[in-house]
Amino acid sequence: MSVRTRFAPSPTGYLHIGGVRTALYSWLHARRQGGHFILRIEDTDVERSTPEATVAILEGMAWLGLDWDEGPFYQMRRMDRYREVLAQMLAAGTAYHCYCSREEVEAMREDQRQRGEKPRYDGRCRERTTVPEGVAPVIRFRSPDDGETVVEDLIHGTVRFQNSEMDDLIIARSDGTPTYNFCVVVDDWDMGITHVIRGDDHLNNTPRQMQILQALGARVPVYAHVPMILGPDKQKLSKRHGAVSVLEYREQGFLPDALLNFLVRLGWSHGDQEIFTREEMVEFFRIDAVNKAASAFNPEKLLWINAQHMQRLTPEGLAQHLLPYLNAVGVTEPLLASGPELPAVVALLQERSKTLVEMAAAAEMFYVAPVAGEPKDVEKHLHGQSALLATMTQALGALPNWEAAAIHSVIQELAVTHADGKMGKVAQPLRVAVAGRAVSPPIDATLALLGKEETLARLRRAAAWI
C-alpha cells in the first residue's frame, strides 16, 4: 500500500515554525517512501479563519519547496460529506442525538466530582425515546464503555487509554456543524491517509478518532506525534521568542533549505551530521527515529546553518537568491548592470555573511556610492588625513594594472612611508573613503571589484567629508 501523509493547518494564524516542522516530517516520510503528500486546510473555525492566513500558509509552503501531490482540500467545502457520514452513523446506532443542556451536563459533572469520580457525560440520552420540543440536539459518538484503546505511536511507543474514562464525544453541534475531531476522521478516511504525523498536543485526541474510524469500519492509520518546540528559555515557543510567521524568516534573509535543515535537526539526527541537502534529508530521515523529548529553538544555530548553506552554494546560485534583497535596499537592475558582476561580489562576501539581508547590506556599496561616511568612522579614520587621502588617490591612479595584488602593494608601500608600516592606518581611511564605513571585505579585493574609475571618484568625493 502506498504511503499517504498529510499536513492539515488551520488558517486561524500564520504558518509557524512548529507547523513547518510537522509539514516537513510528513513531506519527508512521503518522499522517502515514494508516497503522496496531501495538503488540507482545516477551516471549520469560521470566526477565526481568514483568507489572509490561508494565502500565507500556501505561500510559505511554496517558498519552502514543500510541494504537495493532492490538494489543497478545504473542510468547509466538504460539509455535505460530513453530514452524509453523520446520518450513516445515526442510522447504524454508533451515534445518537443528545438533548441535554449545558447546564444539565455541568450539573451532572459536578455531582460526579462531589462523589470523587472523573467528570464525564453519563450517556443518559443514548436510549432516549422522547424528544423534547424546541430543543436542537447535538450528536454524540457512542464510545465503548469498557476495555482500552491502544495507540501504537511511532515516536511515543505504546500509549494506552481506558475507554471508561472517555465520555461520548460531541461530533456535531446543535446547529448541525460537525466538530474538529469528526471532520479529521472523515477526511483521513476519505483521503486514504496511511500515516498521521502531527504535534503531540493531538495525542489525547487520537483514541477518540481511532474509535470513530473503527465504528465506520475504516482502516486506522499509523500515528506519529511530534514533540513541541521550546524557546531558548525552555518555555513553549511563542511570538516573544522571535518570528511568528515562517515568511518572516524569508524577510530576514534565511534560505529555505537552511531553515528546513535546522528544523529537521530539532528532534532527529543522522550520526553527527549537521548540514543536510534536501536530497540527503529525504534519503536519511526516518519518522520512528524522532526523539520524543521536546527540542529547544536556538537562533544562533539557525544563523550558523544558514551561513553554511550560503557558503555551499555557487556564487551564481547565491546571487539569484540575493536579488530581491538587493532590490529592497535600492540596488535596482540598472545599478546592477553598471556595477561589478554580482557573482563576483557574492564570492567576496560569501564567507562573511550569515543571512541574505546581511549580504545585501554589505553588497550595496559596490553599486551605490556613499553620499557621506558614517560620522564616527569619518571622525576616527579620516579626520586630519587630507594629505594621506590625496597621496592614496595619486598612487592608486598611477597603477597600470588594476588588480588586487597590485592594489595591495600600493597600500603596503603607503603604510611604510606614511604609517610606520601599520597597514591599518592606511587601509581603514581608504575603506571609509570608499565604502563610507570602517567595515568591508578585504580592501584590495573591494577596490579591484569597484574598478579604478569608481574608486578614484569616491576618493575625491571623500575629501569633502574631512
Curated annotation (Swiss-Prot):
UniProt: Zn(2+) binding residues: 98, 100, 125, 127
CDD domains (UniProt xref): GluRS_core (cd00808)
Coiled coil: none
GO molecular function: ATP binding; glutamate-tRNA ligase activity; tRNA binding; zinc ion binding
Entry keywords, A to Z: Aminoacyl-tRNA synthetase, ATP-binding, Cytoplasm, Ligase, Metal-binding, Nucleotide-binding, Protein biosynthesis, Zinc
GO terms for biological process, alphabetical: glutamyl-tRNA aminoacylation
UniProt cofactor(s): Zn(2+)
Recorded superkingdom: Bacteria
Binding site for ATP: 239
Cofactor details (free text): Binds 1 zinc ion per subunit.
EC number of this enzyme: 6.1.1.17
Enzyme class, UniProt record, top EC level: ligase
UniProt motif 'HIGH' region: location: 9-19
Motif 'KMSKS' region, residue range(s) on this chain: 236-240
Subunit structure: Monomer.
UniProt family annotation: Belongs to the class-I aminoacyl-tRNA synthetase family. Glutamate--tRNA ligase type 1 subfamily.
Function: Catalyzes the attachment of glutamate to tRNA(Glu) in a two-step reaction: glutamate is first activated by ATP to form Glu-AMP and then transferred to the acceptor end of tRNA(Glu).
Protein name, as recorded: Glutamate--tRNA ligase 1
Organism of origin: Acidithiobacillus ferrooxidans (strain ATCC 53993 / BNL-5-31) (Leptospirillum ferrooxidans (ATCC 53993))
